[in-house]
UniProtKB/Swiss-Prot annotation:
GO cellular component, one term: cytoplasm
Role description: Catalyzes the conversion of urocanate to 4-imidazolone-5-propionate.
Pathway noted in the entry: Amino-acid degradation; L-histidine degradation into L-glutamate; N-formimidoyl-L-glutamate from L-histidine: step 2/3
Pfam family, one: Urocanase_N
EC number: 4.2.1.49
Location of the active site: C407
Protein name: Urocanate hydratase
Cofactor mode of binding and number, as noted: Binds 1 NAD(+) per subunit.
Annotated NAD(+) binding sites: 49-50, 127, 173-175, 193, 239-240, 260-264, 270-271, 319, 489
PROSITE patterns named in the record: UROCANASE
GO biological process: L-histidine catabolic process to glutamate and formamide; L-histidine catabolic process to glutamate and formate
Presence of the UniProt keyword Lyase in the record: yes
Cellular localization per UniProt: Cytoplasm
Length: 552
């Protein structure tokens, strides 16, 4: 991948570079994904998650930009793995962009085949929100991480993480949410990363409190704050596959243990034990096969240490990076003895059609987001947990790129919020249109047996029809852009997932599209969990009037 040093920043304000606000939204969100405040390696088009890109290469990026600038409001741009391949006449209510990223026929759905294609310039890895142009920086995963640690606190520690120590690793675009999510729940956290730049970035954006290269200092500070029952987050420079076994050897057992290193990609995401970043980069280039094997061996040691801590009483869970699968494939037969975070903590929310709903102010004016915060506090005042989240986010979350907000809203709530936002754009309360989207990690848009659909009640973990149906219904209902991806979060061969974005531009046509899309999208989550036999989903469907032909 050619590195290009240019600073990309989404335009602000109300002046259009395109032929309509939906096209403008797609253009600005693509550019926002590559804003240096947002992207992990913008010079390589990498947004987050190892090699999760916004476009296949710089030539494709420029062609997408040019296409969006000339796209008519009754045309649809097709993007295949980060490359624009066609513009077809469609209609005004159709999506302006349809994206398919990283999809491979199942027999060939592995990293080796993907890398062959990538080397030939035929494919890119879109992760989840990188290739679908709706990444908003670390805030995008923050509330989900906050909810996860909050539920862990409710189940195991009396409702708060006060006086507890969490140990984790990985402070990239996704994992970087962990320190703040733990301290928001009142706890102490040591978060390990092998890359000083990642820790520095989290400290700069106020997601992490302090930096150290000393395990002794990290433990001393952690114990001091744990005893005081005060929150603090400590970024520790080092390799988790060395530090966790060392803690086991010393008989030090944290209260909570998890991991968000980029273990989904053994070549580009994980650094083997004993290598500096520079040495790892050299080996990756010279002998990728040996690199991958060393990575897998390190991951196995990492998981062995997590299992040892679990045996000693630590609440241990997988945070969706597929590290258990790698260790299992390397011969660690009890790798799955600790659960994934979705079955352990999140699935009840999915049954209610809840998930990581997000919106972005195309104006670039933070005041537009603060006004939408007030809508949440007013319209959902009975949901104290949600309102607490909004108040904390306002105080503690620094915007990256275009101002944005995330909060978990459920079936019925998303459509209600979307209607209000569109009205606020129409009457001038908000200074420009708002982009509404979500992560692919949502209630009805992903099939991922080691993460979102792990341990489904009916054994349907690997059924991948649901994300396809999700993308189809969102497209026909008029989402502004829709994406279908493979391999996000857990790597090649382990997931299929779909994304959608809808633009609130204040028009009556947008109001109708918003009503349809923000009903069917979370509705798919309720439907998927009803089909799998979850009582809470059945209750939700009956209460909300979701039409499911064979529901008992």
């Amino acid at each position: 991948m050619e590195k290009v040093k240019q600073t990309i920043r989404a335009p602000r304000g109300t002046e259009l570079q395109t032929k309509g606000w939906v096209q403008e939204a797609a253009l600005r969100m693509l550019m926002n994904n590559l804003d240096p405040e947002v992207a992990e390696k913008p010079e390589e088009l990498v947004v987050y998650g190892g090699i999760g890109r916004a476009a296949r290469n710089w030539e494709s990026y420029q062609a997408i930009v040019d296409s969006l600038k000339t796209l008519e409001s009754d045309e649809t741009l097709l993007v295949q793995s980060g490359k624009p391949v066609a513009i077809f006449k469609s209609h005004e209510d159709a999506p302006r962009v349809l994206l398919a990223n990283s999809n491979l026929v199942p027999k060939w759905a592995n990293w080796d085949h993907f890398r062959e294609l990538e080397k030939k310039g035929l494919m890119m890895y879109g992760q989840m929100t990188a290739g679908s142009w709706i990444y908003i920086g670390t805030q995008g995963i923050l509330q989900g991480t906050y909810e996860t640690f909050g539920e862990a606190a409710r189940q195991h520690f009396g409702g708060s993480l006060k006086g507890t120590l969490t140990l984790t690793a990985g402070l990239g675009g996704m994992g970087g949410a962990q320190p703040l999510a733990v301290t928001m729940n009142g706890g102490v956290v040591i978060a390990i990363d092998v890359d000083k730049r990642s820790i520095d970035r989290r400290i700069e954006k106020r997601y992490c409190d302090m930096y150290t290269e000393s395990l002794e200092e990290a433990l001393a500070v952690a114990n001091e704050y744990k005893e005081k029952k005060e929150p603090i987050s400590i970024g520790l420079l080092g390799n988790a596959a060395e530090i966790l076994p060392e803690l086991v050897k010393r008989n030090i057992t944290p209260d909570l243990v998890t991991d968000q290193t980029s273990a989904h990609d053994p070549l580009n995401g994980y650094i083997p034990v004993g290598y500096t970043l520079e040495e790892a980069a050299k080996l990756r280039e010279e002998d990728p096969e040996r690199y991958v094997q060393l990575s897998k061996e390190s991951m196995t040691k990492h998981v062995e240490a997590m299992l040892a801590m679990q045996e000693k009483g630590a609440i241990t869970f997988d945070y969706g990076n597929n590290i258990r699968q790698v260790a299992f494939d390397e011969g660690l037969k009890n790798a799955f003895d600790f659960p994934g975070f979705v079955p352990a903590f999140i699935r009840p929310l999915f049954c209610e059609g809840k998930g990581p709903f997000r919106w972005v102010a195309l104006s670039g004016d933070p005041e537009d987001i603060y006004k939408t915060d007030e809508v949440i506090l007013r319209e959902f005042a009975d949901n104290e947990h949600l309102c607490n989240w909004i108040r904390m986010a306002r105080q503690q979350v620094e915007f990256q790129g275009l101002p944005s907000r995330i909060c978990w809203l459920g079936y019925g709530e998303r459509a209600k919020f979307g209607r209000i936002i569109n009205e606020m754009v129409a009457n001038g309360e908000l200074s420009a249109p708002i982009v509404i989207g979500r992560d692919h990690l949502d209630c009805g848009s992903v099939a991922s047996p080691n993460r979102e659909t792990e341990a489904m009640k009916d054994g349907s973990d690997a059924v991948a029809d649901w994300p396809i149906l999700n993308a189809l219904i969102n497209s026909v209902n008029g989402a502004s852009w829709v994406s279908v991806h493979h391999g996000g979060g857990v790597g090649m061969g382990y997931s299929l997932h779909a994304g959608m974005v809808i633009v609130a531009d204040g028009t009556e046509a947008a109001a109708k599209r918003i009503e349809r899309v923000l009903t069917s999208d979370p509705g798919m989550g309720v439907v998927r969990h009803v089909d799998a036999g979850y009582d809470l989903a059945v209750e939700t469907a009956k209460e909300k009037g979701v039409n499911i032909p064979m529901m008992k």
